[in-house]
Amino acid sequence: MGRAAAIAFAREGADVAINYFPSEEEDAWQVMTLIKEAGRTGVAIPGDLREQSFCRKMVEDAVAELGGLDILVNNAARQQSCESVADLTAEDFDATMKTNIYAPFWTVQAALPHLKPGSAIIATASEQAYDPSPELYDYAQTKAATMNYVKSLAKQLAKRGIRVNGVAPGPIWTPLQVSGGASMEKLEKFGSQSPLGRPGQPAELASIYVQLAAADASYTTGNIYGAGGGQGQP
């Protein structure tokens, strides 16, 4: 979803900085190519968001390369399926919390000094926040937290003219599912129970991120926008 959103922003005229794990360099440079084909500047910043020092450096590097910061999208997430809470290790739980809760917190803190009135912060929540799956105990917690940080931060930053909103995807095909985020049984039926009868593609919700950042969405803040193919919404 981050890839689709980055490309959508570039095609609407934004210069874009993205973060990626060093092991994902080939994918990152594919995104850079598409951003440049759109006639915009692309900046790829490798590193681990679970480290506070890196989150700070990432923001500073993005500001330096882009000449400022107007939009912050917190999209990175960790999702691992675990059938029983008894089998969930403290290490796995901690990794999910660091990626899904700590990293956005650190990134927002680092970005705030650079965000001027009219800026926007957008978070990726999930339908798991309000309709959690039993095997996603830790992930679902983090997405409920994401919904609430959107609503709380929107109230806090309103007086500064900074809007905060979230996007809550339903069954969207992303690397999360095939890298341990869902069982094979779940993958075989993924998205089939939605009213549309299929999973969505990241490109089908990328425009929501763009609209939430747009100047003509200036009265929209503290909201969570669902994209679930017709199933439960926040």
Stretches with model-predicted labels:
Residues V108, T142, V150:
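Active-site helix of classical SDR
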Residues A158, R163, T220-G222:
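Short, small/polar-rich loop/turn modules that mediate ligand/substrate recognition or access, typified
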Residues K155, K159, P169-S194, E204:
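A glycine/serine/threonine-rich, flexible loop-to-helix segment
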Residues C82, D131, S192-L196, Y209-V210, ...:
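Short C-terminal tail/terminal secondary-structure segment
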Residues M1-A17:
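Canonical Rossmann dinucleotide-binding motif of NAD(H)/NADP(H)-dependent dehydrogenases/reductases
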Residues S126:
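Residue(s) in the substrate-gating loop at a strand-loop-helix junction
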Residues E83-V85, T89-D94, F190:
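Substrate-binding pocket helix/loop in short-chain dehydrogenase/reductase
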